[in-house]
């Protein structure tokens, strides 16, 4: 039986970064898909610590909060930088990813039609810090921090990929980010996952907007 279980809705949402991480690291996991109708009936929602998903099982350990899950996998699978300084930078990057993800989620679920044009116009200022970070690390030819992949790379990659769906030209003025996405997308195990029906058939968001 796989050591990990992801309990989540039938969407990419806040779980695709951890799925990409697990796939790229050669880990197996089980999916428990929760239909919205079942969720709204209440028992599972009431049993969840914060009343929300994802829920993540690692053996006897139950975790909630997607970023806590990513950090846990980072620690257990050696994806948290090579020392404390790199770990601090990985945390900083991941917090930056979360800031932009929250803006994205707000657009998708509360203001898509009225807000998309302004959101896309403002997007370059939110992407620029990641381009800057890449430029400061081996000229942008490696990962976002150091010379080994971290959990923040998977989270950033997911964020960039969903923005390429929202605004296909969003990385045109960011050559390092564009090359970074292409480079990570081509990692053999990750490439296989991204081409799989499990990923391809899973909508990005729960309301059909992307």
UniProtKB/Swiss-Prot annotation:
SUPFAM superfamilies: GST C-terminal domain-like, Thioredoxin-like. Disulfide bonds: none annotated. Glutathione binds at residues 8, 14, 39, 45, 52-53, 65-66. GO terms for biological process: glutathione derivative biosynthetic process; glutathione metabolic process; hepoxilin biosynthetic process; prostaglandin metabolic process. The modification Phosphotyrosine is found at residue 4. GO terms for cellular component: cytosol; mitochondrion; nucleus. The keyword Nucleus applies. The modification N6-acetyllysine is found at residue 128. It is found in: Cytoplasm; Mitochondrion; Nucleus. The keyword Mitochondrion applies. Keywords: Acetylation, Cytoplasm, Lipid metabolism, Mitochondrion, Nucleus, Phosphoprotein, Transferase. The modification N6-succinyllysine is found at residues 103, 116. It catalyses: RX + glutathione = an S-substituted glutathione + a halide anion + H(+); prostaglandin J2 + glutathione = prostaglandin J2-S-(R)-glutathione; prostaglandin J2 + glutathione = prostaglandin J2-S-(S)-glutathione; prostaglandin A2 + glutathione = prostaglandin A2-S-(S)-glutathione. GO terms for molecular function: glutathione transferase activity. It comes from the Eukaryota. Residues 83-204 form the GST C-terminal domain. The modification Phosphothreonine is found at residue 62. Residues 2-81 form the GST N-terminal domain. Homodimer. Interacts with CDK5. Belongs to the GST superfamily. Pi family. This is Glutathione S-transferase P. The lineage of its organism: Eukaryota, Metazoa, Chordata, Craniata, Vertebrata. The gene is GSTP1.
């Amino acid at each position: 039986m796989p050591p990990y279980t992801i309990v989540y809705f039938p969407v990419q949402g806040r779980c695709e970064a951890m799925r990409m991480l697990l796939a790229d690291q050669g880990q197996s996991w089980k999916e428990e898909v929760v239909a919205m109708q079942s969720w709204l009936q209440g028992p599972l929602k009431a049993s969840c610590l914060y009343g929300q998903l994802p829920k993540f099982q690692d053996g006897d350990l139950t975790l909630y909060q997607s970023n806590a899950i990513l950090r846990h996998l980072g620690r257990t699978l050696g994806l948290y930088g090579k020392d404390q300084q790199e770990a601090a930078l990985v945390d900083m990057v991941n917090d930056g990813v979360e800031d932009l993800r929250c803006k994205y989620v707000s657009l998708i679920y509360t203001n898509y039609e009225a807000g998309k044009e302004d959101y896309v116009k403002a997007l370059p200022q939110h992407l620029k810090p990641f381009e800057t970070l890449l430029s400061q690390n081996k000229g942008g030819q490696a990962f976002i921090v150091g010379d080994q992949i971290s959990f923040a790379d998977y989270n950033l990659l997911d964020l960039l990929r969903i923005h390429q769906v929202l605004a296909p030209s969003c990385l045109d003025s960011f050559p390092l980010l564009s090359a970074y996405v292409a480079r990570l997308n081509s990692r053999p195990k990750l490439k296989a996952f991204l081409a799989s029906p499990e990923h391809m058939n899973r909508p990005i968001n729960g309301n059909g907007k992307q």
